[in-house]
Amino acid sequence: MTLTTHPPTAVGIIGLGAMGLGMAQSLRRAGLEPSVFDIRADITARFTEQGGTACSSIKELGSRCKIVISVVVNAEQTESVLWGPEGCVAAMRPGSVFVMCSTVDPNWSIRTEKLLAEKGILYLDAPISGGAARAANGEITMMTSGHPDAYALAQPCL
C-alpha cells in the first residue's frame, strides 16, 4: 500500500473526553502536535488555550491527518465519526490509518476494517484502559490489534 505525503506525525484525535483530552495533551508533550475535534466547544477551547490545534469538523481532521484516533464511547458514535455526513472517511486519503479506541463487538471491528480497506484506509482496533489521570500522563494501556502496516504507521502515537 502506498502511503500519502502527510508527515508521519500528522495525527488527529476525535473525542476530548476524560481519555481523549489526556491523550492529546500527552501527544503534544511528545512533540507530535495533534489536531483535535470534539462536539463540545468548551473542551476544544481548553485544548487550544494550551497551544493545541482544533479542527472545525471531523471531515477537516480526516483531511489533515495521516493517523486519526477516535476516542468516542461506542460503536454507534464511531459509525458517525466514520460515515456520518461530516465523517472522516470521505476526507481520509489512502494509506492513512484509523485507530479506534472504543470497546466494540469483534464482528463490528472486523466489518469496519474491511469497509475501510475498500477505501485504502488501514484500521487498528485499540481499546484503552487506565483512566483520565493515566491518559494525561501518557501511561494508558492500549490493547491493539490490526494489520502490521497499520501498527507500524500508528506506532509513534501509541
Model regions and ranges:
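Hydrophobic alpha-helical segments typical of transmembrane helices
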Residues: 23, 43, 57, 77, ...
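Active-site-adjacent beta-strand anchor residues
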Residues: 37, 71, 102, 144-145
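NAD(P)+-binding Rossmann beta1-loop-alpha1 motif at the extreme N-terminus of oxidoreductases
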Residues: 1-71, 96, 132-135
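Rossmann-fold NAD(P) dinucleotide-binding segment
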Residues: 58-123
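A generic "binding-loop/recognition-motif" signal
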Residues: 40, 74, 147
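Short amphipathic alpha-helical segments
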Residues: 24-26, 48, 80-83, 110-113, ...
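Rossmann-fold dinucleotide-binding core
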Residues: 11, 103-158
